[in-house]
From Swiss-Prot:
It comes from Saccharomyces cerevisiae (strain ATCC 204508 / S288c) (Baker's yeast). This is Uncharacterized protein YDR010C. It comes from the Eukaryota.
Length: 110
């Protein structure tokens, strides 16, 4: 199940509603930009703190999302996700190709 670019879900102190363990959230604003089964690809507005969770690796293409500048686009590849942190995500958007820093993009696994 893929979310539409404008249909993000906000995570803010309601982990049970989304069936995410509280220890996996740092309670700063987060948005789910894609999910499938037990995987949640998230963009955080405030990259503070540490997100803890199980080890995971994820690679995908054409995941819809919106980048931090508000351009519509899609994720073309996600590489190097370990302990829920995605180190790099290549992005194609209205602004052209680019990459997103490791502090803003996370993969949750529950």
């Amino acid at each position: 199940m893929c979310a539409e670019p404008d249909d993000w879900e906000r995570i803010e102190r309601h982990p049970r509603k989304l069936k995410i363990a509280p220890r996996m959230l740092d309670f700063y604003e987060s948005y789910i930009v894609w999910r499938e089964g037990n995987f949640f690809l998230c963009l955080r507005s405030f990259p503070n703190g540490v997100i803890r969770g199980g080890r995971c690796f994820f690679r995908a293409t054409s995941l819809p999302w919106k980048n931090v500048y508000g351009y519509h686009g899609h994720i073309t590849s996600v590489c190097g996700a370990t302990l829920t942190r995605i180190n790099r995500a290549m992005v194609a958007s209205d602004a052209g190709m680019g990459s997103i820093g490791l502090t803003n993009l996370f993969l949750y696994r529950v």
